[in-house]
Amino acid sequence: MRLTKSISITRLTLIVSGFITATCNYKFFVEAIIIYPFQENPLFVISLLFWLFSFLSVALLLVCYRFNTKFILIALLICTSVISYFTDNYGVVFDDNMIDNIFVTNLNESLDLLSLKLLFYFIFLGFIPAIIVYKAEITYKTLNQQLWLKIKAITLLLILFAGVTLVFSKSYASLL
């Protein structure tokens, strides 16, 4: 059964990037709004969405090609759903130390972290979107057409990224 009409790799990548930006960054936006209250900085807070979306989209467009697209997008959806749960609920920031800790955690410690809320995050932010990506019928264009689409998309996204960064450069610099 087909869930979606035929879609290009570029469009599918942009949709997944938008989904992840909108659903898996709750804690990030809560913290940003504490520093920059929405009432006083609505354009900057909204610009964060565009900034994250354009950054993630460019990164994904650079690595997603004909035969690896679904694998990468599905793996990313599953991982970000779980990471989002731990970030939203425990304030965990995933960096290289956290990844090292994952590999040294024993089974009993891991079982203590399981909950219905984690299952909810996994199903609705990871598993169901992953099934949709898996069932999506991708229109494969010629190599030249695919490269041209990616170049156009990446160029527009870099312009968006640079534009947002330049307009709000003082605000972005203060986040560092």
What role is predicted for each listed range?
Residues 122-158:
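Cytosolic-side transmembrane helix boundary signature
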Residues 112-115, 124:
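Internal alpha-helical transmembrane segments of multi-pass membrane proteins, especially GPCRs
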Residues 105-108, 134:
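Conserved, well-structured beta-alpha core segment at the onset of a catalytic domain
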